[in-house]
Swiss-Prot record:
This is Phosphatidylinositol N-acetylglucosaminyltransferase subunit H. Keywords: Cytoplasm. Belongs to the PIGH family. It comes from the Eukaryota. PANTHER family: PHOSPHATIDYLINOSITOL N-ACETYLGLUCOSAMINYLTRANSFERASE SUBUNIT H (PTHR15231:SF1). Part of the glycosylphosphatidylinositol-N-acetylglucosaminyltransferase (GPI-GnT) complex that catalyzes the transfer of N-acetylglucosamine from UDP-N-acetylglucosamine to phosphatidylinositol and participates in the first step of GPI biosynthesis. It comes from Mus musculus. GO terms for cellular component: glycosylphosphatidylinositol-N-acetylglucosaminyltransferase (GPI-GnT) complex. It is found in: Cytoplasm. The gene is Pigh. It holds the Pfam family PIG-H. Pathway: Glycolipid biosynthesis; glycosylphosphatidylinositol-anchor biosynthesis. InterPro entries: GPI-GlcNAc_Trfase_PIG-H_dom, PIG-H.
């Protein structure tokens, strides 16, 4: 079963939450943000190149124009490959673990997997960001020798920064899977 809903991020931008239910104990949540606009990209590139052309006409040095074009192209490629994330995905399987994937605008993907026996809980935490209180979903990891202590906090959906209403929906569904996993683990 697949479900798609529209939400907004902390800045008011549009987000699409895609929920896939493969089984009662395997769920995937994908948050997609707005793609890079060709108009805004063209406007910024033209503005930088016009400023470079203005400097070129003042100092009559063609190196200024060439360097600006080269730096703009490298900066754009770096932004698309290392910074701009189009989609973040959280896959939770009760007997296996949690996989987080970030898909960049260039097509590059970054994946992190956390085994379920290392997961203590999934919570919604709050933080102060740019003079606002924001909420974020995070995974609490167990301390290896001390199962009642937390070793690390792993934030989820760092790039998308969804609002609380979106996080609550993902949180409730994750808690259903975790509750089944804990019930299965205690019955063994």
């Amino acid at each position: 079963m697949e479900d798609e809903k529209s939400f907004s991020d902390i800045c008011g931008g549009r987000l699409a939450l895609r929920c896939r239910y493969y089984s009662p104990y395997c769920r995937e949540f994908g948050l997609s943000s707005a793609r890079l606009s060709l108009c805004s990209l063209t406007a910024v590139t033209c503005a930088v190149w016009l400023a470079a052309y203005g400097l070129f006409t003042l100092c009559e040095n063609s190196m200024v124009l060439s360097a600006t074009i080269f730096i703009t192209i490298l900066g754009l490629l770096g932004y698309l490959h290392f910074v701009k994330i189009d989609q973040e995905t959280l896959l939770i399987i009760d007997s296996l673990g949690i996989q987080m994937t970030s898909s960049y605008a260039s097509g590059k993907e970054s994946t992190t997997f956390i085994e379920m026996d290392k997961v203590k809980d999934i919570i919604i935490n709050e933080a102060i960001y740019m003079q606002k209180v924001i909420y974020y979903l995070c995974i609490l990891l167990k301390e290896p020798g001390k199962p009642h202590e937390i070793s690390r906090v792993v934030p989820v959906f760092q790039s998308a920064k969804p609002r609380l209403d979106c996080l609550i929906e993902v949180y409730r569904s994750c808690q259903e899977v975790l509750a089944h996993q804990k019930a299965t683990a205690t019955s063994l």
